[in-house]
C-alpha cells in the first residue's frame, strides 16, 4: 500500500511557495516534465519518501502476484493495474502533503495539484479536528409500546455503555470506547411491525473501528433483550458516519483567480453561479459531485 507522504513545513509564508529546494516542501516546479526516476528522487530528496519507498517504487514490480490475489477474494482470474501519481502543492494546517492518487482518467492529478497550488498561495487549507465517533446499531423487534422500550433503554444507558466498554478495555485505556446511546422507533411499512433501534456511540480513536463496534453491539444484545423483552436482530456498524465528518476550509484571494482573460471577480462569480445551479438542479448536482468524487475515489484506491 503506498504511503501518504508528508513532512512538516517550517516556512508558512505563501510568498515562498515556489521554492523547490525546501526540505519537505510539496511544491516541486516542473515535476510533470521529469522522468519517473527523477520524480521519485525529488520526493526522496525532500524527505517525502523513505528509502524503502524508493526501492519499492523504482522496482517497477507493483502488481499483486496472481497466487496472492487468489487468496484475497473469490473466483480470481487475474489482477488489474492502474497508474499511481501524486498531487503536489498541498499545504494543510501549515504542513506539506504529497497525496497519492490511483486513477486512469487524465487531468485529475494535474487539476488537483493546480487547485492545491492556488489554495497554497492563500495560506493553504485549514482542517478542524474530527471526533472519531462511529455508530453501532442494535435492532430490537417488539410487541410493546416503543416509547416505554426507549425509556427503559435510556434508564439503563450507563449499564449498557459499561458493558460495551468491558469488551474492549484497551480501547478505553487509549481514551476511546463507548460513550452513549441513542434510541429511535420505526414501524415496518408492509406488516406494521414495531421496532426500536438503539445507537451505540463509540469513540474509536485511531482505529478504523468496524470490528470493535460490531463486537460491542453483539456483546450488549442479550442484555438489551432482557431489558426490553424484545428480540434483537441486526447488531452491526452503520456506515453513515455523520458524527465523524472532516471539515476543511480555504480562503483564496480574488486576485489569485485572475487568468485566461478573466478578472478574479469574473472567475469568482462564475464559480458561485455554478455552485448555485448544483444546489438547485439535481442534474448539475450529479456532475458537480462526480467531479468531487474523482479525487475522493483516486485517494481511496491509493490508500486502501
Locations of regions flagged by a protein language model:
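Small-residue-rich
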Residues: 69-72, 78-193, 197-201
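Acidic/polar, glycine-rich intrinsically disordered N-terminal extensions of enzymes
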Residues: 4-97, 101, 105, 125-133
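Flexible, glycine/charged-enriched surface loops at secondary-structure junctions
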Residues: 54, 124-130, 167-180, 227-239, ...
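Generic structural signal for well-ordered, non-membrane alpha-helical segments
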Residues: 36, 65-69, 105-109, 149, ...
Amino acid at each position: 500500500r503506498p504511503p501518504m507522504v508528508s513532512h512538516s513545513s517550517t516556512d508558512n509564508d505563501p510568498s515562498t511557495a515556489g521554492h523547490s529546494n525546501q526540505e519537505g516542501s510539496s511544491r516541486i516546479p516542473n515535476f510533470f516534465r521529469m522522468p519517473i526516476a527523477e520524480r521519485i528522487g525529488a520526493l526522496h530528496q525532500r524527505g517525502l519518501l523513505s528509502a524503502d519507498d524508493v526501492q519499492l517504487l523504482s522496482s517497477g514490480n507493483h502488481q499483486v502476484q496472481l497466487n496472492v490475489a487468489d487468496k484475497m477474494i473469490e473466483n480470481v482470474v487475474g489482477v488489474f493495474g492502474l497508474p499511481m501519481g501524486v498531487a503536489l502543492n498541498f499545504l494543510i494546517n501549515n504542513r506539506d502533503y504529497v497525496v497519492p492518487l490511483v486513477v486512469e482518467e487524465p487531468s485529475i492529478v494535474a487539476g488537483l495539484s493546480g487547485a492545491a497550488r492556488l489554495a497554497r498561495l492563500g495560506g493553504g487549507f485549514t482542517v478542524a479536528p474530527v471526533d472519531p465517533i462511529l455508530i453501532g446499531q442494535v435492532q430490537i423487534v417488539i410487541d410493546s409500546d416503543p416509547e416505554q422500550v426507549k425509556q427503559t433503554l435510556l434508564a439503563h444507558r450507563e449499564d449498557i455503555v459499561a458493558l460495551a466498554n468491558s469488551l474492549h478495555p484497551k480501547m478505553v485505556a487509549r481514551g476511546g470506547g463507548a460513550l452513549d446511546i441513542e434510541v429511535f422507533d420505526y414501524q415496518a411499512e408492509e406488516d406494521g411491525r414495531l421496532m426500536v433501534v438503539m445507537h451505540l456511540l463509540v469513540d474509536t480513536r485511531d482505529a478504523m473501528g468496524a470490528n470493535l463496534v460490531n463486537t460491542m453491539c453483539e456483546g450488549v444484545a442479550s442484555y438489551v433483550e432482557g431489558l426490553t423483552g424484545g428480540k434483537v436482530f441486526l447488531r452491526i456498524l452503520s456506515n453513515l458516519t455523520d458524527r465523524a465528518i472532516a471539515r476543511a476550509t480555504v480562503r483564496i484571494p480574488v486576485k489569485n483567480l485572475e487568468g485566461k482573460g478573466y478578472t478574479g471577480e469574473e472567475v469568482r462569480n462564475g464559480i458561485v453561479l455554478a455552485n448555485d445551479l448544483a444546489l438547485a438542479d439535481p442534474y448539475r448536482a450529479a456532475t458537480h459531485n462526480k467531479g468531487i468524487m474523482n479525487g475522493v475515489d483516486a485517494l481511496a484506491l491509493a490508500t486502501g
